Amino acid sequence: MARFAPDATYLSYRDVTPEALTAAGIHALILDIDNTLASYEQAEPDEAVRAWLGALTEAGVRVGFLSNNHGERVTLFNKTLGLPVLFDAHKPLLKNARRMMAALNATPSETAFLGDQIFTDIWTAHRVGARGFLVPPIKDKTDLFTRFKRRLEKGILRRYYKKNPDAPDVRPERRQKGASV
Protein backbone atom coordinates (compact mmCIF):
# COMPACT_ATOMS: atom_id res chain seq x y z
CA MET A 1 0.00 0.00 0.00
CA ALA A 2 3.00 2.33 0.21
CA ARG A 3 2.55 3.16 -3.47
CA PHE A 4 -0.79 4.78 -2.61
CA ALA A 5 0.19 6.54 0.63
CA PRO A 6 1.00 10.23 0.22
CA ASP A 7 4.48 11.44 1.06
CA ALA A 8 2.88 14.41 2.83
CA THR A 9 -0.56 15.86 3.41
CA TYR A 10 -1.52 19.52 3.44
CA LEU A 11 -4.79 21.21 4.36
CA SER A 12 -4.52 23.45 1.30
CA TYR A 13 -2.27 23.98 -1.68
CA ARG A 14 -1.28 27.28 0.00
CA ASP A 15 0.46 25.30 2.74
CA VAL A 16 2.98 23.97 0.20
CA THR A 17 5.56 26.75 0.42
CA PRO A 18 8.49 27.44 -1.88
CA GLU A 19 10.80 27.28 1.15
CA ALA A 20 9.58 23.82 2.17
CA LEU A 21 9.88 22.53 -1.39
CA THR A 22 13.40 23.77 -1.96
CA ALA A 23 14.50 22.58 1.50
CA ALA A 24 13.25 19.10 0.52
CA GLY A 25 15.16 19.24 -2.76
CA ILE A 26 12.01 19.67 -4.85
CA HIS A 27 12.52 21.97 -7.81
CA ALA A 28 9.52 20.93 -9.92
CA LEU A 29 5.87 20.74 -8.87
CA ILE A 30 3.28 19.08 -11.08
CA LEU A 31 -0.22 20.20 -10.21
CA ASP A 32 -3.70 18.86 -10.63
CA ILE A 33 -6.27 21.62 -11.15
CA ASP A 34 -9.76 20.35 -10.40
CA ASN A 35 -10.55 20.11 -6.71
CA THR A 36 -6.90 20.84 -5.90
CA LEU A 37 -6.53 24.50 -6.91
CA ALA A 38 -10.10 25.27 -7.93
CA SER A 39 -13.56 23.73 -7.97
CA TYR A 40 -14.74 22.14 -11.20
CA GLU A 41 -17.01 25.13 -11.77
CA GLN A 42 -14.25 27.74 -11.40
CA ALA A 43 -13.09 28.55 -14.93
CA GLU A 44 -10.07 30.69 -14.06
CA PRO A 45 -7.56 30.82 -11.19
CA ASP A 46 -8.45 33.17 -8.37
CA GLU A 47 -6.04 35.71 -6.94
CA ALA A 48 -4.86 33.34 -4.19
CA VAL A 49 -3.86 30.70 -6.76
CA ARG A 50 -2.11 33.33 -8.91
CA ALA A 51 -0.18 34.70 -5.92
CA TRP A 52 0.85 31.20 -4.77
CA LEU A 53 2.00 30.19 -8.25
CA GLY A 54 3.88 33.49 -8.56
CA ALA A 55 5.70 32.84 -5.28
CA LEU A 56 6.67 29.35 -6.43
CA THR A 57 8.03 30.47 -9.79
CA GLU A 58 9.78 33.47 -8.24
CA ALA A 59 11.57 31.05 -5.89
CA GLY A 60 12.72 29.02 -8.88
CA VAL A 61 10.27 26.12 -8.55
CA ARG A 62 9.25 24.90 -12.02
CA VAL A 63 5.49 24.39 -12.19
CA GLY A 64 3.21 22.65 -14.66
CA PHE A 65 -0.36 21.34 -14.86
CA LEU A 66 -1.18 17.69 -15.48
CA SER A 67 -4.93 17.22 -15.69
CA ASN A 68 -7.29 14.44 -16.66
CA ASN A 69 -9.81 17.09 -17.68
CA HIS A 70 -10.41 18.14 -21.28
CA GLY A 71 -8.40 20.68 -23.20
CA GLU A 72 -10.89 23.54 -23.22
CA ARG A 73 -11.24 23.62 -19.43
CA VAL A 74 -7.50 23.30 -18.74
CA THR A 75 -6.50 25.80 -21.43
CA LEU A 76 -8.95 28.38 -20.10
CA PHE A 77 -7.67 27.93 -16.54
CA ASN A 78 -4.07 28.34 -17.71
CA LYS A 79 -4.75 31.21 -20.14
CA THR A 80 -3.48 34.01 -17.88
CA LEU A 81 -0.77 31.87 -16.26
CA GLY A 82 1.10 30.55 -19.28
CA LEU A 83 2.48 27.48 -17.50
CA PRO A 84 3.30 24.16 -19.18
CA VAL A 85 0.14 22.08 -19.38
CA LEU A 86 -0.95 18.61 -20.43
CA PHE A 87 -4.65 17.77 -20.47
CA ASP A 88 -6.47 14.48 -21.04
CA ALA A 89 -3.48 13.07 -19.15
CA HIS A 90 -5.07 9.71 -18.30
CA LYS A 91 -3.48 9.61 -14.85
CA PRO A 92 -2.32 7.19 -13.46
CA LEU A 93 -0.83 6.22 -16.84
CA LEU A 94 2.77 7.37 -17.05
CA LYS A 95 3.25 8.73 -20.57
CA ASN A 96 2.02 12.26 -19.89
CA ALA A 97 3.52 12.41 -16.40
CA ARG A 98 6.90 11.71 -17.96
CA ARG A 99 6.22 14.25 -20.70
CA MET A 100 5.45 16.91 -18.08
CA MET A 101 8.64 16.14 -16.15
CA ALA A 102 10.57 16.48 -19.41
CA ALA A 103 8.83 19.79 -20.15
CA LEU A 104 9.92 21.02 -16.71
CA ASN A 105 13.43 19.61 -17.22
CA ALA A 106 13.01 17.68 -13.98
CA THR A 107 14.15 14.34 -12.64
CA PRO A 108 11.85 12.20 -10.50
CA SER A 109 13.94 12.80 -7.37
CA GLU A 110 13.42 16.57 -7.61
CA THR A 111 9.72 16.40 -8.55
CA ALA A 112 6.52 16.32 -6.51
CA PHE A 113 2.92 15.97 -7.63
CA LEU A 114 0.16 17.81 -5.77
CA GLY A 115 -3.44 16.68 -6.00
CA ASP A 116 -6.60 15.63 -4.21
CA GLN A 117 -6.87 11.99 -5.33
CA ILE A 118 -4.82 9.01 -4.27
CA PHE A 119 -5.56 6.82 -7.30
CA THR A 120 -4.62 9.48 -9.83
CA ASP A 121 -2.24 12.05 -8.38
CA ILE A 122 -0.39 10.14 -5.65
CA TRP A 123 -0.16 6.85 -7.50
CA THR A 124 1.07 8.58 -10.66
CA ALA A 125 3.77 10.38 -8.67
CA HIS A 126 5.00 7.17 -7.11
CA ARG A 127 4.89 5.25 -10.39
CA VAL A 128 7.31 7.75 -11.97
CA GLY A 129 9.53 7.85 -8.86
CA ALA A 130 8.45 11.29 -7.63
CA ARG A 131 6.85 12.37 -4.37
CA GLY A 132 3.10 12.74 -4.00
CA PHE A 133 1.44 15.40 -1.85
CA LEU A 134 -2.25 15.14 -1.01
CA VAL A 135 -4.69 17.95 -0.24
CA PRO A 136 -8.37 17.56 0.60
CA PRO A 137 -10.81 18.05 -2.27
CA ILE A 138 -12.11 21.60 -2.47
CA LYS A 139 -15.60 20.33 -3.15
CA ASP A 140 -17.05 16.86 -2.73
CA LYS A 141 -17.89 15.50 -6.16
CA THR A 142 -20.85 13.19 -5.90
CA ASP A 143 -20.73 11.10 -9.07
CA LEU A 144 -20.75 7.37 -8.44
CA PHE A 145 -17.18 6.65 -9.58
CA THR A 146 -15.67 9.41 -7.42
CA ARG A 147 -17.68 8.28 -4.38
CA PHE A 148 -16.38 4.74 -4.94
CA LYS A 149 -12.75 5.94 -5.14
CA ARG A 150 -13.16 8.09 -2.02
CA ARG A 151 -14.36 5.02 -0.08
CA LEU A 152 -11.22 3.13 -1.12
CA GLU A 153 -9.08 6.13 -0.17
CA LYS A 154 -10.47 6.07 3.38
CA GLY A 155 -8.72 2.79 4.20
CA ILE A 156 -5.43 3.98 2.76
CA LEU A 157 -5.63 7.23 4.72
CA ARG A 158 -6.58 5.42 7.93
CA ARG A 159 -3.35 3.39 7.70
CA TYR A 160 -1.38 6.51 6.70
CA TYR A 161 -2.52 8.40 9.82
CA LYS A 162 -1.74 5.45 12.09
CA LYS A 163 1.87 5.74 10.90
CA ASN A 164 1.82 9.57 10.71
CA PRO A 165 -0.43 10.77 13.56
CA ASP A 166 0.91 14.33 13.43
CA ALA A 167 0.30 14.81 9.69
CA PRO A 168 -2.42 17.31 8.70
CA ASP A 169 -5.66 15.33 8.42
CA VAL A 170 -7.16 15.80 4.95
CA ARG A 171 -10.04 13.36 5.43
CA PRO A 172 -13.27 15.32 4.80
CA GLU A 173 -15.14 13.58 7.62
CA ARG A 174 -12.41 14.59 10.10
CA ARG A 175 -12.21 18.17 8.94
CA GLN A 176 -15.98 18.58 9.07
CA LYS A 177 -16.05 17.34 12.66
CA GLY A 178 -13.49 19.92 13.67
CA ALA A 179 -10.56 17.65 14.33
CA SER A 180 -7.47 19.59 15.22
CA VAL A 181 -4.85 19.51 12.51
Question: Where does each model-flagged region fall?
Answer:
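Asp-based, Mg2+/Mn2+-dependent phosphohydrolase catalytic module
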Residues: M1-L31, A38, Q42-A43, A48-F113, ...
